A protein has these predicted regions:
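Ribosome-associated RNA-binding proteins
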Residues: 1-255
Length: 255
């Protein structure tokens, strides 16, 4: 009898457990609780100009007489000394290498940003000049010699660290990041979307790496100490920039 009672109790427990599991799978358990949200940023002092959109840039500069120029590759080499900090905006596309911007790139940026931005809450500003450097070309099938070719088009040189487009207003990074990232991918040099705080943090990290570097064999010390007569194969450009640039390319791992 005791064995029969135990078996009955076990079978009843199994059946009740199965019923509970079936009920729990079909029923939705509702619960209420407290949730803390982040305080939204204050945009009271945000500056909004009368014309918030990017203006049209001329394809050809308004010169009385167009003059041909040499290549002057130093225009895209090394760090930028102008337009490398924010003025009025909070977010920007920053160049991480040197290169030439054509008028087609500028039109692509202008049309993409102007179509997708909200002019009531944000504004965009150019941080580059219109194309001004002439590039010459010769037609196909011409013989060697005969002097420099005719001017074909104009470009704008860009160096590492220069801001291309700046965006500001009553806006957060999540609202404009996808627009600026889409534009940055199409540029002829590596570029990145950064905020004011990100740019300051990047400069601060570079300065901290230089200050707390424990490796005594840095490029700067080796080059300035002329170890093994290294100075005879180094250019003044490499010595001036402590080997952080090879032409238009930036080497972030160098300290």
């Amino acid at each position: 009898r005791e064995k029969q009672k135990k078996s009955l109790l076990q079978s009843l427990q199994r059946s009740t457990n199965q019923q509970r599991s079936l009920l729990q799978s079909q029923l939705k358990i509702l619960s209420a609780g407290l949730k803390t949200y982040e305080i939204p940023p204050d945009h009271r002092d945000a500056f909004l100009p009368e014309k918030p959109k990017l203006k049209f840039l001329n394809k050809v500069p308004n010169f009385k007489k167009a003059k041909k120029e040499m290549k002057r590759l130093r225009d895209i080499q090394g760090p930028a000394k102008a337009a490398n900090t924010f003025i009025t905006g909070q977010y920007a596309i920053v160049a991480l290498g040197g290169g030439y911007l054509h008028w087609g790139h500028m039109e692509m940026m202008r049309l993409t940003i102007n179509r997708k931005m909200d002019p009531k809450t944000m504004f965009a500003r150019w941080r580059i000049n219109a194309p001004y450097k002439p590039i010459t070309r010769k037609g196909l099938g011409q013989r060697m010699g005969g002097g420099k070719g005719a001017i074909d088009h104009y470009v704008t040189p860009v160096k590492y660290g220069r801001l291309i487009v700046e965006i500001g207003g009553k806006v957060e990074l999540g609202e404009v990041e996808h627009i600026l990232t889409e534009v940055a991918k199409k540029l002829p040099f590596p570029a990145k979307v950064l905020s004011r705080e990100d740019l300051e943090a990047m400069h601060k990290e570079q300065a901290e790496r230089e200050k707390n570097n424990q490796n005594p064999w840095t490029f700067k010390d080796i080059a300035r100490g002329n170890m093994m007569g290294l100075r005879k194969v180094l250019s003044p450009f490499e010595i001036r920039n402590d080997g952080r640039f090879t032409g238009k390319f930036h080497l972030p791992e160098r300290v």
